[in-house]
Amino acid sequence: MDHITMEEKINKKTKHIFSNNYDNILSDKQVQCIYKEFFNNNKDNNNNKRFNENGNQINQIDFNSNKEEEKEEKEEKEKEEDEDNITILDDVYYSLEYDFEDYIKYSKILTEKIEKERITQLFEQEKQNRLIRYHQRIQQQKVIKEQLNVNMELLEKRKLLETELSLKSNQLNQCQTQLQQFQSTMTLLQSQHQQTINKLKQTQSEQLQKRRNQQHQNLLKKQKIQKEKEEREQKEKEQKEKEQKEKEEQQQQLFLLQQQQQQEEESKTTNKKKRNSRTTSINRVFRSLLTDVKVPAKKFNGLKSEAQEEMYDQLDTVLNQLKDYSDHSFPFLTKVRPSEAPNYYEIIKKPMDLSLMTKKLKKLEYQSKFEFQLDLNLIFTNCRIYNTDPSGKVYVEHANKMEKKSKDLMKNVKDLDFSMDILKDIVDENKNNNNSNNSVDNNNSLKKGRTSTPNKKQKTSNSTTTTTTTTTTTTATTPNLLNTPLSSPPYTPCSPSTISTVSSTPTTPQSADCPLSPFQQQQQQQTQAQQQPTSNSPRNTTTTTTTITSPISPRETNKDVIMEEEEESSSSSLSSSSLALNSQNENGVNKSIEDSTGVKMESEESTNVKKEENQSGDCENQTTTTTTKEEGEEQQEQEDEEQQQQQQQQEEQTLEIENEEDIINNFNSEIESLNNDFSEKTLQLSIQIKEISEKTEHFKINNSKIQQNLDELPLADKLNLDINNAKELVDDNIELDDSEIIIPPYLNNNNNNCNNNNNNNDNNNNNNIDNDNDNNNNNSLENSFEIEKSKKINKFKELTKENRVRKLKYFLDQQSLPFNKREAFIRTPYFMNTFYNLDLQQQNQKQQQIFNQEINDNDDDNNNNNNNNNNNNNNNNNNNNNNNKPKVMSAIQKMDQDFMDLKVGFFPELTHLSNSIPIITPNYPITCKNSSIDNSVTTPSKSLLRLLNSSKSNNNSNNKKEKQCNYNREGEDDEGRGEEQKEKEEEKEDEDFPNIITNDIAYILLSKSIAKSIESESCLHGTTQETMLIFTDIVSSFIGKIGKLFNKYYSNNGLPNNKSTTTQTTPTTQLQPPPPPPSLSLPPSLLLNSIVTDIFGDSLGILLLKDYMIKKSKNQQIYDDPLFELEVEFENDHLQSDNILQNNNGDIDINESMEIDILGEDDIIDIDDTGLFGHYPRYIEEPAEITLFIDPKPIQKPTTNTTTNNNNNNNNNNNNNNNNNNNNNNNNNNNNNNNNNNNNNNNNNNSNSNNNNNNNNSNSNNNNNNNNNNNNNNNNNNNNNNNNNNNNNNNNNNSINNNNHNNNNNNNNNINNNNNNNNNNNNNNNNNNNINNNNNNNINNNNNNINNYNNNYNNNNNNNNNNNNNNNNNNNNNNNNNYPKPIQASTQTGNLGIQQQLQQQQLHQLQQQQQLQQQYQIQQQQLHLQQQQQQQQQLKLQQIQFQQMQQQQQQQQLQQQTRQPSQPQTPQMQSQPQTPQILSQPQQQLQQLQQQQLQQQQQLQQQQLQQQQLFQQQQQQQQQQQQQQQQQQQQQQQQQQLLHPQQMQIQQNLQQPLQQIQQQQQIQQQQQQQLQQQQQQQQQQQQQQQQQQQQQQQQQQQQQHHQQLQQLQPQQQQQLQQLQPQQLQQLQQLQQLQQLQQLQQLQPQQLQQLQQLQQLQPQQLQQPQQLQPQQLQQQQLQQQQQPQQQQQQPQQQPQQQPQQQQQPQYQTTFQSIASPKEKDKEREKEKEREREKEKDRKFKKVKKTESKKESKKSLNDSSNSDINTSVEQHSPLSPQPISSSKPTPPPVSSKQPQTTQSNTTTTQDSIPPIEQKKKRGRPQKKQ
């Protein structure tokens, strides 16, 4: 069911009426009819609700509709959904705030009720408070106990943690000591091990040396024996040769017999061959069978056991699976490239990847699972170390996943270790090889040779070599593998040894790189000599042996390497040949050499084959040769013998080698044993060290954690203190207070004052009787009060009908706004201070009036007098409140003010919307909170007080204008009387008392608050509207404090910027009001929008704020007021912004902007819907208390009823004697003030003549006079106090108030009366100063005389006015004595004394009122006459001044025409800033002045640059001249060498004087340069000084200009705007002429410099002219004609100059004003001048060429002799070198063409012809 209220239905029916026709608003009767219809239709509905608020009854009925009604309502809702939902405020009659009479009666009734209610409430409150306190104490005890327990627990925890920390710290120290001990033992073991090894090596080297010495001796013996054998053999050979010859003879004889036998034997030989062929074929079959046998291939060859093969297969599968894990394995497959990661190999010293692990696995380098796992872990650790950046987290994740998978795969691999087994095998094989070599027979040793079984580590390496040796072979010793530790990585293989081919000649040993000893060299020579005879024998049997060289580990010591090289060299020297062959398969792949049996088989087969071949060869030799069996036997015997000898030698050598090998093997075995022992010990120590280090780290981590926990806990001392304090606070005995409740009575100020009277008991009795009577009459008063209420309500309805209709219309218009929160446009009372500015005076008036009324109720005799006093008091209160009205207010405020003016009542409920307050604040206000208002108003910030005090100190005279205007309304007859006079007086008061706020205060307050708020939140970005939106968030906290100061003088709505709407309605005949003082000015219409944007709205302002915050963050100083720092930075910006403004410097006067508009019934001015930001931002939702937006609805100007009634006779507590004294004293004061005013006026006249000294004197006079006034007032008040004898306390209070009010009133009257005169005189002087800055002193004196005359006349009028005003002031002295102290003092004397005083005062007041009314009418008539006279005088003065201006301008024009400036027109160099002639646009003129200043600075800079360029050019020319001179000297020296010695002497004699002249010229040039530099420096200094002076003058002039602008009146604006355009043109001419004069002052300085340079030139050139007079006579005769022709040309040019100078100078000044026709004529003239100049130039060139030709001819004629020719070629007097050496004068600027020409003519006459020719060379070309 839809729950619909009665108000909604009313709105539905009235919606169309209000939405379409706002004028057809319902009346009261129509509203009542609508209510009745709903009551009749809904009788059944009993859900009516009523509520009362202050006497008004509003009936709101909620009813449940029937089904039929629901359908109708639904249909209506559907229709109305399309339309806008508009909520209408009900036309409800609010409760009245009672009048003053009713309030006094009703207050007595309410006091008792309120006291009873208060007592009951307080009684219950105290009970509740006691219960609350009881429970609070219990809760506090619980909290204290809980805290105590917590602190106890924390202490226990702290003690436990400290004990743990001490124990673990001891353990950690123990572990550290153990570590140090183990480390020391490690170092000792290492040192001992190294010492033992060194000793063994020394013993081994000694044994080897002894053994070698023995071998050397044996060799010497053998050599002797061999020599003897050789001799024997030679002899035997000789015998054999003889025998052979004999045999040959015999053989020839038997040759024939042999042929026969051969045929027989041929058959035998064929059979033998067949047998031999079969044997060879059988051998081949065996070979083929051996090759066909193929062993099954294995992945890893060289492994000894099957367990090792299984381990390698498992590791291979792990690697393959990791590689196949492609999602995460791709970064670890290959090496890292340096291009991808350049710093990788600098950070990671041991790189590893999967490809490198596969290589190591193929090389059989992994001997355990642990080594393989280390390499895998190394890959992942390298990845984590390098990829520490966040960009490398991806690779770390890949590494983590690969590590997980590797752990899963490695679980399947068996944990085996084969490192120790390999070492044992190596040792056993070495021993077996030694034993087998000793047991082998001699024959087997020749055929098979010795073989050394390879080591396991040798097999793992890919580099294996096979060597074939001829008779003897040497086995390489195994490396010292045991020296290396087990934990080291596997050995890397060394490069394979070079392979040597088999040859009959002996080969060099393999170790060719190592050097041979002399003993070894002898052995090699012997072996070569022995092998030569044997090499020829055909039956040299060769034995092939395979020797496998073991790889050398990189970690072997250098000593082991040296020992092996020595052994190899010794073995190679003894062996005849040791060659190696690589056994290869058919495919070319190296076969493995693991099985020693296979090698032996091949070697045996090779030996058998060679034997068979030798046998076949022998058989063939036997057939060919015819030797006998005997010879063959002999040869065999010889061979056998040789073989036996060789075998013996070999056996000896083998024995020697074996002995050496035994020594080495023994040494190696000892070292191995030592290494094993050392390794075992070190392993144990390393394990122990690791365990201890882990323990230490564990202890450290635990200690750190414990320490953190201790740090988090509070200290033990604090805990103990807290525990002790808590124990003291604990109390178990807590009980309720059962004592009696005593409530003190509510005591008003009246009761307190009465109780304080101890002397007068009668008065207390009377008060008690009165209170009893009041209690009895309460019931009767209540009944009468309700009857009167109905009458007043009817009056209220009739009077407020129009106002209520207006208010409804306004709210309906406001409801049409497009946003939800309409209250955002209305400011709350908390932030508005327009009507809440209730001073203490008003509050005290109210209290005193109530007190007087209560006294009058008690006294029956004085009722009539009391009624009169009450009427007067009410009238005075109303008039005082009218003074508090703002001149500008919002629409709602005006509506409420209209209600208040009707004197019917007030709506307290509307204060939230209307920002207004009742006349008399009730004891219990409904909506207004005085606490919030008082706190905000009475406690301003210190910075604001400083600023306000500073502004008051500067404007003491203007801030004391608070005038008290009291309005009297005694009936409709009084209101109609004198309305026209009142309006005129109001206009005058508005002129005298403008509502003004200083613009400086507004800027300072806003800039301070914003700067402080930005310190906390610096969020400013952007410009214009966006910045303002951000300021709303920042400045919201600041509006509540500072907005109250502005809202005293302004309303919600801003002032209209467009003056066209207001100025149209003002009458033309009415004179404009006088201007405000120069020091005060209004802020603009919208405060935040205008001020904040001017300061910080631009982007530059925001940047400056940011810079300010950055600077402040760097600086450590803290300032209370940051504005004083910002003012320095923003000073230039404010000046520019002020200059840009056009009209009034951003200041607006209320009287000009808001004038009374006669618009008919509704005096409304429509303004555009623009707030601070131009629109309502929809994303901002403000609360109702804070509002930055302005009500867009129309503004209504209130009618200003500011009539000046100077009759305030309410509270004159002084006697007649006191008043008479005051009259006399005030008359004296007025006389003093008049004298002061005369001084002020005279001083102002002098100040306008720009005399600073006079201004200072005038200020001093003003201050002294003001002090005199104050002193006089104080004396007068003291006299008043002496006359008062009855009431001491009252007189003391009155004396204080009189001191203040007399001073204020006297000063205000004197100042206000003299404002018009001073301002008028100042304005007249400003006209003279602004327009006639160049006038004579005589005119100023005349003006001053006129002004003095006016001042005297005005002062006479002021005296009369002051005398009249003093009478008013005497009556007004005691109007404001409303403090509560007099009430307290009167209670001491009793009620009777107070009543007598009041009666006397009332009688005295009635008499004074009649007198004052008569005086007031007379004063008004006098004022009107004075104003008329003043206006007439001002008009006359203006006419006189205008005529004087015209005369002065004519005189100046005549003077300017007579002047003939020597210089042509130049651009404006400098212009004195003058006061603006067109005052409607002062800011444009300021901009022009700034532009002129910039132009001046630019021109000065250009001049400086030109001077610098000239100086540089001169320097360059001098350098060129010096270079040319050097070249000439070199040429002269070369020619002198060729000339005859006699000629040389002649030339030297001639050149000596010339050289002297050149030296003198150089000295003079240097001096000139120095002078020029000094002059330039001086000029620069002068220019800088001038610039500084100009800047200072400009600043002073700008300040004066601002002051003058502020002092100008709107009347001057109109007058000057009406001036003719011709006069304005003349004023512009004056400015331009002054600029030309300044330029003329600058040019003579430049001309003097040029003349000095030109005077120096002829002096330099006269010296060489005197030396050669004979040679130059002919040249002078020829060139005399040229200067005459040149003199004619400059004569033509000066004739043109005066023509140009005679032209009127107005051409320069009136260029901007001249017509276009005149401009065209000037252009044509300029073109003609340029054409003439070009013709002159051509004519000069022709003459130059002719003069050059003639000079050449003359020189050729003069050079007759060879000597003279040589001298002329080399002499510096020739024209070319002189022209180069001569410094050219500085080029004249284009701005001064005429002056340079005139100067050149004068110099050419004095210069001789040759010098003139030299000058014409280069400078004329530059022209």
From Swiss-Prot:
Any single GO CC term annotated in Swiss-Prot or TrEMBL for this entry: SLIK (SAGA-like) complex
UniProt entry keywords in alphabetical sequence: Bromodomain
Disulphide linkage map: none
GO terms (BP aspect): regulation of transcription by RNA polymerase II
Compositional bias ranges of the Basic and acidic residues kind: 65-77, 225-250, 601-614, 1716-1737, 1744-1755
Biased composition (Polar residues): 580-590
Biased composition (Low complexity): 251-262, 432-486, 494-511, 520-555, 570-579, 753-779, 863-884, 949-958, 1055-1071, 1205-1378, 1679-1705, 1756-1767, 1789-1806
Domain Bromo: start-end pairs: 306-413
Acidic residues bias spans: 631-643
Sequence ranges of Basic residues compositional bias: 210-224, 1813-1823
Region Disordered, residue ranges: 44-83, 200-281, 429-654, 753-781, 855-886, 949-993, 1055-1079, 1190-1386, 1453-1477, 1679-1823
UniProt GO molecular function: structural molecule activity
InterPro entries the UniProt entry points to: Bromodomain, Bromodomain-like_sf, Spt7
Source species, domain of life: Eukaryota
Protein's name according to its UniProt entry: Bromodomain-containing protein DDB_G0280777
